[in-house]
Amino acid sequence: MREMPIAMDICPRQKTWEEYKYEIEALKKSNNCNSEKEEIAFARSFSFSVMKFLWRNVNYKKRWECRQIKMVSKRLDIYAIRLAKDIADYFITLNIMEYAYLMGAMYTMLLPDSYRSDNGVYYTPPSISERLLDLLAAEGADWAEDKVLDPACGGGAFLVTVANRMLGDYRIKELSAIEKIEHIEKHLSGIEIDRFAAWITQTLVDILLYSETIAAGRRLKSIVKVQDTIQCIETETRRFDVIVGNPPYGKIKLDEETRKLYSRSLYGHANLYGLFIDASLRILQSGGLVGFVTPTSFLG
């Protein structure tokens, strides 16, 4: 009598983020970039591919195209494309605050060490961004009323989280879809010097508001400006009730004009996070709140 074959579960096991990180690091090492410029182009091309696949997963109504961005790109091989798709499929199993952080962390991981160091690029885990927003709320921040800015918003860790809190407030829940979109456009803003990181942030906010935009019949206007916060602050006419974020760290050389502008807060070498604090105080409403992730050296 023939034995019946044993039924087996052949569904592949879902990889962990640590396993994907290992593959991303291996991909970076095998990429054979000959210059920092090529490394940056690869980091952006791979991250762009992940975001495009992620958008395809979210855009089930096929209503909106993913926002476009002009960038120097590097052609990806079939393995890199498959890995990008797998990562996007993994992200969609998480909540948006988690994969917003992982998206920024992945982009940072792929960037050259020198670029990260020179630009003070770090991304904020959801536990820290949520904790900082809780502290601001305890001090009186009102996510349904206040105008909020993240002056270094690359990766979207704070803009996405604040937008989610705005949408979760009972007063905002009562609004129509179009009113919710208009509220976000009026009350939430970001500034980011890295054009690609700004695009990631804007696209993540688009994903968060996808259902509202479908119901309203229009897209969210861009809420992220591509600018250097330190340099643009003199011409910034908007004022904010809450300024929150994780500003870049690291010493910076200033030209004479910029040093004069920030002279009130300079003691010895200029540090980026110190300049961001000064810049933020200049555009803060009277009685407003600033909440930043800062190094312990800030405490003296």
Predicted regions span which residues?
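A short N-terminal interaction module
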Residues: 2-113
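SAM-dependent methyltransferase catalytic region
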Residues: 62-90, 94, 98-300
